[in-house]
Swiss-Prot record:
The lineage of its organism: Eukaryota, Metazoa, Ecdysozoa, Nematoda, Chromadorea. This is Homeobox protein ceh-30. One of its GO terms (biological process) is nervous system development. Disruption phenotype: Worms undergo programmed cell death of CEM (cephalic male) sensory neurons in males. Residues 95-154 bind DNA. Residues 49-98, 209-237 are annotated as: Disordered. Cell-type specific anti-apoptotic transcription factor required for the sexually dimorphic survival of the male-specific CEM (cephalic male) sensory neurons during sex determination. In hermaphrodites, the homologous cells undergo programmed cell death due to transcriptional repression of ceh-30 by tra-1, the terminal regulator in the sex determination pathway.
Length: 237
């Protein structure tokens, strides 16, 4: 029993016409893309035989996803003007220099030098850096930071003295402390304290007011009860 060709039911006029069959055969032989032959059919065996050929043709023309991915990975990436700046989050931040850690001995020497000299010349700074085993930049940076701290503390001290009651407390401290009294009396008489604006003679008792204590073996001095009192009203006049 022979199988029936479905084309004879769809196009019976063209199927039975020999001229039409000859034209179809000629067109199938000349066109490589669309092959139409009289022997083609819709049988399962014929379809299975044609599917490998069709898949091979599709592989030649359609690139696979793997090939596209490989081409994209191997192709050089186009760099945009802002590509380098946006490459990583940390690239935009400026790299910070490592903070210098000074030893206790170095800090002590720096503090002693700063106490004597608030500003250093280039030669003095180089000598100090060489003596302590530091670089000139490290000493310069420390001095700048220390001067900033010193100015800030001085400003805070002046603000405290401007408050009511603080000025009199400082005056009492200078009057009652032998340390400050001896320190200030060593200065020329008539010199004014920058933070108080008062002459030394009005703040510090004269030198003869300090008498060594006879009842104690301690070499420390004491203030005589006859030391003059501070008269702030005279300064206001």
């Amino acid at each position: 029993m022979s199988l029936l060709d479905p084309r004879q039911f769809l196009l019976p006029a063209f199927y039975l016409d020999p001229t039409t069959q000859a034209l179809l055969a000629q067109a199938a032989s000349t066109s490589p893309c669309n092959k139409i032959s009289s022997s083609s059919s819709f049988r399962i065996s014929d379809i299975l035989e044609q599917s490998p050929n069709n898949s091979s043709h599709s592989n030649d023309h359609d690139p696979s996803p793997q090939s596209i991915k490989s081409d994209f990975s191997t192709s050089p990436r186009a760099s945009s003007p802002g590509g380098d700046r946006m490459g990583s989050p940390g690239s935009c931040k400026k790299s910070r220099k490592a903070r210098t850690i000074f030893t206790d001995k170095q800090l002590q020497e720096l503090e002693n030098t700063f106490e004597k000299q608030k500003y250093l010349s280039v030669q003095d700074r180089m000598d100090l850096a060489h003596r302590m085993g530091l670089t000139d930049t490290q000493v310069k940076t420390w001095y700048q930071n220390r001067r900033t701290k010193w100015k800030r503390q001085a400003t805070s001290g002046m603000d405290l003295l401007s408050e009511p009651g603080n000025l009199s407390a400082v005056q009492n401290l200078i009057r009652s402390s032998p340390y400050w009294a001896n320190y200030i009396t060593a200065l020329p008489m008539g010199t004014q304290l920058p933070m108080m604006g008062l002459p030394m003679s009005m703040i510090v008792p004269p030198a003869h007011a300090f008498q060594p204590s006879s009842s104690s073996n301690s070499p420390s001095t004491h203030i005589s009860s006859e030391s003059p009192q501070l008269d702030v009203s005279s300064n206001s006049e």
